């Protein structure tokens, strides 16, 4: 989602191909053998297959909302924490059955322990959001790179999330989910079919 956010806000023309990861098209695997999404194939054939790299590329083309105007090293440090400790805990909290070797068979206790790790990360974000966004009063690369993962976390147990002492975090997420940008990237698309 975060790659789509940056592509959309940049206004760069691109062709979206929604693919089923259960039946990966040969074209996807030819472009990026690791077979994950997103993948951006540029007109010259260069392939960018990491979402954060796609965000950087799109915003380097056009950054009309100033997502890159804040100190890049500070934003990247925050994103690294999100993509590292928080994302690891999120995956294990949301899908504990995928980590049975790590859970010693008690997936429920394992999921709750992972939720606690994720909570610690989110608690650090709460005071940063006093002006509405992570780096002040306007969205930044850091906001748009982290919000999709915070959204996944919140929707894993929405009632529990709503009861947490994070009013600024919830307001941030609610504003994002109500935005036209979010709606535009969440539009459903048919799976692309190869012509071969």
Model-based region annotation:
Residues 57, 156, 185:
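Residues that scaffold the ATP/ADP-binding catalytic core of kinase and kinase-like folds
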Residues 74, 78-175:
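GST-like fold's C-terminal all-alpha helical module
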